[in-house]
C-alpha cells in the first residue's frame, strides 16, 4: 500500500454491479468469487473508504469486515479499521481470514513481494484472495507514453509499478493456487485509459482535466451518478470511453492478449 491524495477517495458507497462499465465489471467479479459461507471473516487490503466491503456487506450481511490502509477513512461505519504503514506487517494472526480482497492496490505497493507475503500469511488455508490489478507493463500504449516521460503514470495515477501479466502470474503462483483469471482493459480500453491520464500533462487543458477527475465534480464512480456525470462534456466522454472499454472487455474477458487489467481469484494451499 502507499498513500495517495485524499481527492482520490470516492466515498463509502458500493459500486453498482449492474452497470455496464468497468467499475461494474469489477463489482460483479467480486460478487461471483465470494465464498458460500454466510459469515466469512473478510479483509480488504487497501480499503480506502470501504466501497468494496460495502458490496460484500450487501451480499453477506453476517460477514465480519475489516480493512487496512495507510490513511484512515473518513467514516468507517460498517467495518473495523487498522491503519498500517506501507510495508508494515499486518496486525493480524497467521491463518485468520476466510477472504482477502484488494482492488487497484498492488500497483501502488512499494514492495509487492512483501505485500503478497503478508496477505498469504493472514489468509487461512483454503481461503481466497480476490481482486484486480493493472498490468500496464510490456508493449502497448502505456509504454509509449512512458518513453516520453518515465514517471508519467507515477505522477498522474500514483502507480509505482507497471507489471506485465507474466510478472503478476509469477508473483501469484509462487504463493497461491490460481483458481481463475479474467482480463480487461484490452486494446481500446488500454489506449483510452493511457491517453486520458497522459493528458493530465498537457500544458493548458491537462490541469483542468485533472481537477475534474480528482475534484468534487467527479461523480463517475458514485453508484447513481451517470446522469450527473454526463452534464459536463468531459464527464460524458469519460462515460462513453468506459462503456466502450466495458463491451470490449466483456467480449475478450478470457483473452490475455493485449489485456492490461487482471482480475484474479487465488487460494492459499
What are these regions (language model features)?
Residues 103-106, 132:
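Residues lining the SAM
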Amino acid at each position: 500500500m502507499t498513500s495517495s491524495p485524499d481527492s482520490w477517495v470516492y466515498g463509502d458507497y458500493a459500486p453498482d454491479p449492474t452497470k455496464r462499465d468497468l467499475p461494474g465489471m469489477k463489482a460483479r467479479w467480486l460478487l461471483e468469487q465470494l465464498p458460500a459461507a454466510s459469515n466469512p471473516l473478510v479483509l480488504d487490503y487497501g480499503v480506502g473508504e470501504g466501497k468494496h466491503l460495502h458490496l460484500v456487506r450487501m451480499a453477506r450481511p453476517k460477514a465480519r469486515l475489516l480493512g487496512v490502509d495507510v490513511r484512515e477513512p473518513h467514516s468507517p461505519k460498517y467495518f473495523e479499521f487498522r491503519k498500517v504503514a506501507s510495508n508494515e506487517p499486518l496486525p493480524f494472526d497467521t491463518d485468520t481470514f476466510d477472504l482477502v480482497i484488494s482492488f487497484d492496490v498492488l500497483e501502488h505497493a512499494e514492495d509487492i513481494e512483501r505485500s503478497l507475503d503478508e496477505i498469504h500469511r493472514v489468509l487461512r488455508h483454503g481461503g481466497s484472495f480476490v481482486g484486480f490489478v493493472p498490468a500496464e507493463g510490456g508493449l502497448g500504449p502505456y509504454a509509449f507514453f512512458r518513453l516520453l516521460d518515465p514517471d508519467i503514470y507515477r505522477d498522474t495515477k500514483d502507480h509505482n509499478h507497471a507489471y506485465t501479466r507474466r510478472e503478476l502470474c509469477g508473483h501469484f503462483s509462487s504463493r497461491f493456487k490460481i483458481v481463475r483469471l479474467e482480463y480487461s482493459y484490452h486494446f481500446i480500453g488500454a489506449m483510452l485509459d493511457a491517453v486520458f491520464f497522459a493528458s493530465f500533462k498537457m500544458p493548458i487543458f491537462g490541469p483542468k482535466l485533472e481537477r475534474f477527475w480528482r475534484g468534487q465534480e467527479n461523480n463517475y464512480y458514485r453508484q447513481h451518478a451517470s446522469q450527473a456525470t454526463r452534464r459536463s462534456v468531459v464527464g460524458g466522454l469519460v462515460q462513453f470511453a468506459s462503456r466502450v472499454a466495458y463491451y470490449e472487455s466483456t467480449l475478450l474477458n478470457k483473452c490475455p492478449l493485449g489485456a492490461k487489467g487482471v482480475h484474479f481469484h487465488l487460494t492459499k494451499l
